[in-house]
From Swiss-Prot:
Keyword Transcription regulation: no
Record's protein name: SsrA-binding protein
The gene coding this protein: smpB
GO annotation, biological process: trans-translation
One Pfam family per UniProt: SmpB
């Protein structure tokens, strides 16, 4: 008999930072690989990742992911020291790094991690250049969203009256 395929989700997304779009105005998108250890890959496969408060930091002309929490499994080996909050190096092209460094140093942008996902067998991090929003910016975005919903309702009702 043939084995049945297990039902797996088609999504390659590991973790999302849902508050990033709310707290920052995001401009340029970047994708980078991550330098990970074996226990981290096992934990990521089991879904023990949190990137809600993490960001990318430039140090010595290299990019590092700070604040991401990858919790070790209970069955992790005892001879390896598992630090869930360690800084993880991002693997980027020199041209991308130069562009990022210029924007961060000159223009005052921040680097915000928005998603972690699988691409083939590698873990990738999606991050954006962005600036923090003030409270009035957040309020105006909420008003714009509500107006778009109301406008859709009005147009729907207007079309039904015909």
């Amino acid at each position: 008999m043939a084995k049945k395929k297990s039902k797996s989700s088609n999504s390659n997304t590991i973790a999302l930072n849902k508050k990033a779009r709310h707290n920052y105005s995001l401009t340029d998108k970047f994708e980078g690989g991550m330098s990970l250890q074996g226990w981290e890959i096992k934990s990521i496969r089991s879904g023990k990742v949190n990137i809600s408060d993490c960001y990318v930091h430039i140090k010595d002309r290299e990019a590092y992911l700070l604040g991401a929490e990858i919790s070790p499994l209970n069955a992790a080996s005892s001879h390896v020291v598992c630090d869930p909050n360690r800084d993880r190096k991002l693997l980027l092209n020199r041209r991308e790094l130069d562009k990022i460094i210029a924007a961060v140093e000159r223009d005052g942008y921040s680097l915000i991690a928005t998603a972690m996902y699988w691409k083939a067998c590698w873990v990738k991090l999606e991050f954006y250049l962005g600036k923090g929003k003030k409270d009035h910016d957040k309020r105006s975005d909420i008003k714009d969203r509500e107006w778009a919903v109301d406008k859709g309702r009005l147009m729907k009702n207007k079309n039904l009256d015909r």
